[in-house]
């Protein structure tokens, strides 16, 4: 991850010119823990690792570190256990050797005074306009592990958290929650930072990384969030939804062949019109031979969908983003440009999908409609009534839903 173009802004008490003491607005975004290399300063064997990290033969901190090699020898008696997902940096001030400095990856949207763009980082990591800002860890103790730093920095809005330096340099306030739409402000030499608010009138969307723990381990996802509901602590929402018991069971399997148990569907009373309507709205899911359990929950607030693996969940997650692709004809908005293009066929009257069965030739604007139509010819009826003793099958899910209502009405009339 280190590169020759990386810019470091030191906060070790060095004075800065008055004209760049003003607050610069930056957006802080967490990154997956896997992408940061953990290094330990202080062991004899560590000298060999310097060459691998781009340090060269004289133990200089190559790749943008630029520290003299002899500092490594001052540190041999300061042995600390490795920090999780943090990269310690050696300071030029010998009095500061016992302080670890954590690296925060910052994604900026505007020019930061006093530095070049870090092009090397941009190429490797896929971020734009990044700088690395070492923030001295709080002095005072045994606290060698700074846990969850990468998670709690995300789009921080709550004021709180430490990172203040004993040497009187700058500090970054880190919020504990996952609130979005707020900005963190970094003050170069003033030694203080405050959380400002975003414009309350505008609904702002931004992407942020969220750390998710599952039984299989931890992983990180990028998700969209708007600043509409600032009073929600996102972290608690994620924790609640990941636990399988708290998520509603997936009843859609009853739409394609699984029969209802004798007592009806657990948790659903089909004689209640509201619950029945909810059941009828469920989309059928394709049954696979190797159907793995769905243990990964969508972390978006209010979404109860479950997925078999992380990649499926990530693919779904972007659907919660802002609908920025708007149809000029009717104003309908879509998350993806491809969905807008497909929708525009409705206005153009274009029907590119044609039934190839002999003597038919019907045309459709959407491939989905053609697939549904073809079942008329093939006799494929995948939607099976879930009620015991009823073996009716249907080519379209809407027909099955209408049929289910007849069972419910008959039950109510008894």
From Swiss-Prot:
A zinc finger (C2H2-type) spans 296-320, 325-347, 353-377, 383-407. Gene3D superfamilies: Classic Zinc Finger. Interacts with YAF2 through the region encompassing the first and second zinc fingers. Component of the chromatin remodeling INO80 complex; specifically part of a complex module associated with the DBINO domain of INO80. Interacts with EED and EZH2; the interactions are indicative for an association with the PRC2/EED-EZH2 complex. Interacts with SFMBT2. Found in a complex with SMAD1 and SMAD4. Found in a complex with YY1, SIN3A and HDAC1. Changing residue 380 to Y: In GADEVS; reduced DNA-binding; reduced transcription regulator activity. Residues 57-66, 158-170, 188-199 have a biased composition (Gly residues). Residues 333-371 are annotated as: Involved in repression of activated transcription. This is Transcriptional repressor protein YY1. Residues 33-81, 157-203 are annotated as: Disordered. Keywords: Activator, ADP-ribosylation, Differentiation, Disease variant, DNA damage, DNA recombination, DNA repair, DNA-binding, Intellectual disability, Isopeptide bond, Metal-binding, Nucleus, Phosphoprotein, Repeat, Repressor, Spermatogenesis, Transcription, Transcription regulation, Ubl conjugation, Zinc, Zinc-finger. The modification Phosphoserine is found at residues 118, 187, 247. The gene is YY1. Residues 371-397 are annotated as: Involved in masking transactivation domain. Residues 295-414 are annotated as: Binding to DNA. Residues 1-170 are annotated as: Interaction with the SMAD1/SMAD4 complex. Residues 116-260 are annotated as: Gly-rich region involved in interaction with HCFC1. One of its GO terms (cellular component) is PcG protein complex. Residues 67-81, 171-182 have a biased composition (Basic residues). Zn(2+) 3 binds at residues 355, 360, 373, 377. Changing residue 366 to P: In GADEVS; reduced DNA-binding; reduced transcription regulator activity.
């Amino acid at each position: 991850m280190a590169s020759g173009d990386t810019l470091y802004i030191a906060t070790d008490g060095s004075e800065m010119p008055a004209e760049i003491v003003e607050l610069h607005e930056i957006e802080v975004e967490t990154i997956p823990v896997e992408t940061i290399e953990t290094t330990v300063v202080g062991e004899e064997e560590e000298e060999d690792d310097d060459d691998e990290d781009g340090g060269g033969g004289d133990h200089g901190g190559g790749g943008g570190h630029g520290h003299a090699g002899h500092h490594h020898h001052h540190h041999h008696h300061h042995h600390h256990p490795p920090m999780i997902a943090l990269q310690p940096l050696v300071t030029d001030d010998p009095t500061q050797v016992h302080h670890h400095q954590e690296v925060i990856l910052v994604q900026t949207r505007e020019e930061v005074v006093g530095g070049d763009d870090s092009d090397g980082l941009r190429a490797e990591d896929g971020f734009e306009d990044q700088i690395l800002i070492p923030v001295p860890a709080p002095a005072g103790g045994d606290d060698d592990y700074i846990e969850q730093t990468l998670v709690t920095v995300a789009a921080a809005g709550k004021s709180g958290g430490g990172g203040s330096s004993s040497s009187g340099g700058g500090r970054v306030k880190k919020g504990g929650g996952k609130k979005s739409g707020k900005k963190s402000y970094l003050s170069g030499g003033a030694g203080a930072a405050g959380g400002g608010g975003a414009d309350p009138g505008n609904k702002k969307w931004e992407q942020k990384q969220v750390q998710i723990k599952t039984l299989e381990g931890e992983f990180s996802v990028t998700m969209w969030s708007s600043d509409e509901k600032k009073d929600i602590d996102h972290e608690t929402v994620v924790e609640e939804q990941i636990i399988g018991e708290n998520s509603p069971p997936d009843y859609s399997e009853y739409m394609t062949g699984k029969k209802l148990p004798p007592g009806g569907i657990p948790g659903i009373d089909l004689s209640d019109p509201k619950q029945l309507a909810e059941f009828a709205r469920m989309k059928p899911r394709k049954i696979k031979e190797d159907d793995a359990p769905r243990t990964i929950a969508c972390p978006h607030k209010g979404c109860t969908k479950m997925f078999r693996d992380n990649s499926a969940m990530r693919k779904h997650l972007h659907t919660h983003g802002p609908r920025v692709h708007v149809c000029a004809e009717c104003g309908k908005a879509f998350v993806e440009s491809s969905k807008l293009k497909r929708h525009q066929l409705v206005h153009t009257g274009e029907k590119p999908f044609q039934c190839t069965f002999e003597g038919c030739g019907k045309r459709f604007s959407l491939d989905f409609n053609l697939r549904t139509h073809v079942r008329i010819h093939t006799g494929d009826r995948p939607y099976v009534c879930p009620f015991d003793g009823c073996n009716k099958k249907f080519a379209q899910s809407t027909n099955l839903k209408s049929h289910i209502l007849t069972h419910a009405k008959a039950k109510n009339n008894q």
